[in-house]
């Protein structure tokens, strides 16, 4: 059983695309989905109210964020599934999963820390660094997935960075225990802290992914503080996208 945890801020329209892509391309991946969302003004809140009313998926629990750290840790602690898939609102499943969730779970053997839906042999660009990705050479494979030693990679590179909520599947208890063990104040800090500490905290030195990824992020804007690299090629401010969504144009 895999549950989903989605984080969203000011991007109801982009979240809608993610939910629609789950419905079309990964309808049986997630048993239950919790969405923790926040809005910085009334217009963004209207976007989320519109999205809720559309009921794109039947298995969603909505939670308005009050305190990010507390809400996030509680969501991990109260998650009833053995596995959890982290997602953020600018992710999209762009094609069908090549296998079932049972096979994904079966690939999470004792030596595997996480399963990445975002990585694959076709992953060629690391948008945060704005450069080409060093390709996997040393890996194991079967007909649908590849496995590699993430501890042999720099934590600044995708293949050495297992702690991500952009489509990574973890053992819920393991991720929960790690998250409660170290202090953080916001999402990027959580990723950075846990990414560094987990190299020492876990003996699971492998990551697994489909041979070709099924999900990517669309960084056309950034709502995080401090900001990430976003929108260099195709800048779409979240305010404009939200207004088009409210007006029925998106």
Predicted regions and their residues:
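A structural signal for short, well-ordered beta-strand segments and their strand-loop junctions
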Residues: 84-86, 113-118, 169, 205-211
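Short, well-formed alpha-helical segments that are part of the catalytic scaffolds
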Residues: 11-26
